[in-house]
Swiss-Prot record:
The active site is at C120. It is a multi-pass membrane protein. It holds the Pfam family DHHC. This is Palmitoyltransferase ZDHHC21. The keyword Membrane applies. InterPro entries: Palmitoyltrfase_DHHC, PFA4/ZDH16/20/ERF2-like. The chain crosses the membrane at residues 5-25, 45-65, 132-152, 182-202. It is an enzyme of class 2 (transferase). It is found in: Golgi apparatus membrane; Golgi apparatus, cis-Golgi network membrane; Cell membrane. GO terms for cellular component: endoplasmic reticulum; Golgi apparatus; Golgi membrane; plasma membrane. It catalyses: L-cysteinyl-[protein] + hexadecanoyl-CoA = S-hexadecanoyl-L-cysteinyl-[protein] + CoA. The keyword Acyltransferase applies. It comes from Danio rerio (Zebrafish).
Amino acid sequence: MKMRLHFVVDPMGWFCMSMVFFVWIYNSFLIPKLVLLPHYAEGHITAEPVICYYLASLLCFSALFRASTTDPGKLAQDPKIPLAERDNWELCNKCNMMRPKRSHHCSRCGHCVRRMDHHCPWINNCVGEDNHWLFLQLCFYTQVLSFYTLVLDFCQYYYFLPLSSVDQADFAVHHELALLRVSCFMGLIMFGGISSLFYTQVKGILTDTTTIEKMSHLTEEVPRRPWQQAMAEVFGTRWKVLWFLPFRSRHPLKLNLTIRSHV
């Protein structure tokens, strides 16, 4: 699958996504400036914590960018349906297009999405078959970055040695306490909310149930698959190390096809 940029024209989605971006850039700039770099310069910490924080920040932003700009599985205008699979397709009663079963018509985006999980305003995009793996990465790295930020906020006042060579006239240094309190508040909100979302997403994958199917009470009893198989289908590869890399393309990996009713 080629990496094509996909944008949704939705002012509310742009607003929600800008809030997420603000939280990311606030902590990615503030924590190194007030905590990591000054303590590294004075020899209180080694380079590893600094590198790890920047790496977590980079992976989080990469997953955010990829999840918001990757086509979630939009159906072509005139799909070519193989003869052997015609029984697994149906007509959408909103856009009058043929689509695979378990697809859903997104009223926000105005088109059908293959195996759509939900529309997420925080990434201004649908979460579907082709970008679900990126959404999972975003949730995972947001948890990592938020937790790391909370740990550093705590260490700044209760563990690290006092700094002696900082510029007290600098705005960020002068208002350090207030700025780090805001950082801590953001970290708590993000870590708590995303942890709950990540749990429900992983549970849905393991039970082969989308968020829309759960909300519509249209779930069916299906045999439980091994977790490795379920996750491999979402990420498009059996190589577990690749599950954590947003800098790649996904290729469909159908290990076990389950057909259900549509929503």
